[in-house]
Swiss-Prot record:
InterPro entries: Cut8/Sts1_fam, Cut8/Sts1_sf. It comes from the Eukaryota. It is found in: Cytoplasm; Nucleus. Residues 38-51 have a biased composition (Basic and acidic residues). It comes from Ajellomyces capsulatus (strain NAm1 / WU24). GO terms for molecular function: proteasome binding. Binds the proteasome. Its main location: cytoplasm. This is Tethering factor for nuclear proteasome STS1. Keywords: Cytoplasm, Nucleus, Protein transport, Transport. Residues 21-32 have a biased composition (Low complexity). GO terms for cellular component: cytoplasm; nuclear membrane. Involved in ubiquitin-mediated protein degradation. Regulatory factor in the ubiquitin/proteasome pathway that controls the turnover of proteasome substrates. Targets proteasomes to the nucleus and facilitates the degradation of nuclear proteins.
Length: 312
């Protein structure tokens, strides 16, 4: 009969005490929250350590660095079209002859550029000047006809223009290496030595009239030698001429030229007369220069000299 009696209702304020708070419900899900703390728990990484050890590569505080300008890839042009080369690229395609031709034409059209080019260009050296003369010499010999008489009038007419080109270049380069334009006599002598050697290699022709150009070039070369020798004699008493062996070199050039440089040889001999030539020094190397000293030490000095008697 008691079972048929209704259960009295529970007051509403009892339901509020039965609800769990969110904090307690979350803490109840942690399995380690209901167990005792152990010693090994001190060595386990915490959530804070895990968050600090994470890589900051994706952090917004470190924006990605841009690539350097040299590594940036050029974007293709949307519309490609033909265009001329820049000046630097155009000059790279020109060889020496083409570049010389362009520069010469510019100086002809604009004369004020000629002075600028002369002051800007480096001073030509002896080797560069002799190389130009050797190029003219090679062009001359390559134009001599093969077979037959190489010193005939026909051969001369074939190479006459090359002879003119070589002699014109020789007459232009030689004053450049003469004083006062060239202050170093050693440089001037070195150029004259090489230029005279190139002049020797000009062929001799059967017709004497065809040799007038070469003979005139020898006369001009002799004047150049005389000018440099006199200038060198003013500096240090001509010591450079003495110990450079230039007397032997010039004598050899004069012999090869058939005596056409004799005037230069005479001027050199007069400048070296007071000290003797290098040949005289080489001949006197075998003489005992200490013979007077030996006579003084042995007491025989002046034994062969007559003794003067009377008042001095």
């Amino acid at each position: 009969m008691n079972s048929l009696l209704a259960t009295p209702p529970v007051p509403p304020h009892f339901y509020e005490h039965c609800r769990l708070s969110p904090s307690r419900s979350m803490s109840s899900t942690n399995p380690s929250g209901n167990r005792k703390r152990k010693a090994e728990d001190d060595y386990l990484p915490s959530d804070h350590d895990t968050r600090m050890s994470a890589s900051p590569s994706n952090s917004p505080a470190f924006p990605p660095r841009p690539l350097p300008a040299s590594r940036q890839i050029k974007r293709p042009r949307p519309n490609i079209s033909g265009r001329p080369l820049s000046l630097s690229r155009l000059l790279e395609t020109l060889d020496t002859d083409a570049l010389r031709s362009v520069l010469r034409s510019m100086c002809d059209r604009h004369p004020e550029l000629a002075t600028e080019v002369v002051h800007t260009a480096p001073r030509p050296s002896v080797s560069s000047a002799l190389q130009v003369l050797n190029n003219y010499q090679s062009a001359l010999h390559s134009s001599i006809p093969l077979g037959g008489n190489s010193s005939s009038d026909y051969a001369y007419n074939r190479v006459r223009q090359h002879i003119v080109n070589l002699l014109d270049a020789l007459s232009d380069f030689t004053p450049h290496f003469l004083p006062p334009n060239e202050s170093q006599t050693s440089t001037a002598l070195s150029y004259l030595d090489g230029a005279t050697e190139i002049l020797h290699r000009l062929p001799r022709w059967d017709t004497p009239q065809n040799n007038l150009e070469k003979d005139a070039a020898y006369e001009e070369m002799a004047k150049a030698w005389i000018l440099v020798i006199r200038e060198a004699g003013k500096r240090g008493g001509g010591i450079q001429l003495q110990y450079g062996g230039w007397d032997e070199k010039l004598s050899k050039h004069n012999q090869t030229a058939g005596g056409k440089l004799q005037d230069a040889v005479d001027v050199l001999s007069s400048n070296l007369g007071w000290m003797g030539t290098s040949q005289d020094l080489s001949n006197n190397q075998g003489v005992d220069t200490s013979s007077i000293r030996q006579q003084l030490l042995s007491g025989t000095y002046g034994s062969g000299m007559p003794l003067k008697v009377g008042r001095w």
